[in-house]
């Protein structure tokens, strides 16, 4: 089931021709997701219908794109935080959520987001450009990013600006 507010995203995107030529293109060993599949992923995350093992880095990026299409940065951050905390709690790993990393990745997605593109192209672009999970270590020292404070609150990068 696709959340009620998300059809507006599809409507917004219908104004722009999707530049993806091959919906079956393989990326990270999985086919490129369609708009409906992306929105279903968000719905399944929000309703905790995904197994913990089903939600990977590329899925975090997909959700970030959807939230940033639907809302401003702070509202998207609130939704991302809420969804991830609920998901982690549901799977018995409530302490897994990391505020600094969540905001870092959301900012990285926002910087690359072109809302004139269709949703699936934006997701594909985010997944291609932000596939390296270690990117955060170009901005943060290991000590800083692994601190309790970074897990609980937003910390500015200590190596270079995000």
What do the PLM-derived regions correspond to, one by one?
Residues 33-50:
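Intrinsically disordered, low-complexity serine/threonine- and proline-rich regulatory segments
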Residues 6, 16, 26-28:
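Aromatic (phenylalanine/tyrosine) cluster motif
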């Amino acid at each position: 089931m696709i959340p009620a507010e998300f059809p507006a995203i599809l409507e917004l995107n219908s104004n722009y021709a999707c530049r993806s030529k091959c919906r079956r293109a393989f990326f990270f060993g999985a086919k490129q997701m369609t708009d409906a599949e992306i929105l279903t992923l968000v719905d399944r995350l929000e309703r905790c219908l995904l197994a913990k093992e089903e939600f990977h880095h590329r899925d975090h990026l997909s959700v970030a794109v959807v939230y940033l299409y639907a809302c401003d940065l702070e509202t998207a951050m609130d939704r991302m935080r809420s969804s991830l905390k609920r998901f982690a709690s549901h799977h018995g790993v409530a302490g897994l959520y990391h505020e600094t990393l969540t905001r870092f990745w959301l900012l990285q997605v926002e910087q690359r987001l072109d809302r004139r593109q269709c949703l699936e192209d934006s997701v594909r672009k985010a997944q291609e450009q932000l596939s390296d999970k270690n990117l955060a270590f170009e901005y943060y020292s290991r000590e800083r990013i692994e601190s309790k404070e970074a897990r609980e609150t937003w910390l500015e990068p200590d190596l270079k600006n995000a």
